[in-house]
Amino acid sequence: MAQTWDTQAYEKNGAFVHGLAGGVVGWLAAQPGERILDIGCGDGQLTQRLTATGALVQGVDASPHMAAAARTRGIAVDEASAESLPYADGEFDAVFSNAALHWVRGQDAMMAEVHRVLRPGGRFVAEMGGHGNVAAIRVALIAVLARYGHGDLENEVNYYPTPEAYTTRLKKAGFRVEQMELIPRPTPLAEGGMAEWLRTFRRGVLDNLPGELREKVVAETTALLAQALRDEEGNWIADYVRLRFVARA
C-alpha cells in the first residue's frame, strides 16, 4: 500500500521527525565536501541541516509532493524510489536516511541500490522504525479496522525489523555493519494529538476506507489509546522505537 502525503499536515504534525534526528545526524558526522545522498528527504528540513555542514547533499523522495516541498527550500532533489536510484555507481561518499526506510516495500532492492551508488568503503547511516515501533497504536488501529472488515490494511503499511534481522539483511547485500541499536523513544505529539497523527501517518490506510468510515476509525482508535498514551496533563506520547545503524559498503 502506498502512503500518500499532505505536506502541510506533515509540517504541522510531524515536526518531531526532523526535530529528534540529532542522534542519527551525529552518527553520520557529515564533512565539508562529502557527497551525501539523503533517501526519503521529505520536505527537506533535515536535508538543510546536512547542507549546513558544507557537505554536497542530494535529496531523493518517492513523493512528488514532498519533493516539491523540498525544492522550495533550495534542496537539490529527485523524485524517485529507493529501489531504483537515478545515480551512477560509486557516486556518493555516504547515504543517509531518517524516518523513511520503514516505508520502503522492496528492502533488498533498496539495499542493493544503496550499495551500488556508494563508493567502496562508503557509509550507509540511517534511522528507521524498529521492532515494537508504535505497537500500541498499531494494535488499536488493527482492532478498530477489524470491526469493519479491514483489519489487514495496517499490516501492509510499514516494516519494523529487529536489529538481528536487519543486520542479516544488510550483510547479504554486501555491507559490513559497524553499529546497530534499537532505541525506545517516547515521542510527544503535536497539538492535534493522536487523531492528527493518524490522519497524517496513516493516510494511506484511511484513504482505502469508504469515506464515511474514515473519521469513525480515527475517533474509535483515538478513544482506545487515550488511557495508554496520554499523560497526566492530557498530552499524547507515542510509543516510538527507532532502529539506528552505520554500515559500510
Language-model segments: residues:
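C-terminal helical/coil "lid" or tail adjacent to the Rossmann-like core of SAM-dependent
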Residues: 173, 178-233
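Short alpha-helix
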Residues: 159-173
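Conserved class I S-adenosyl-L-methionine
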Residues: 1-34, 45-49, 66-69, 123-148
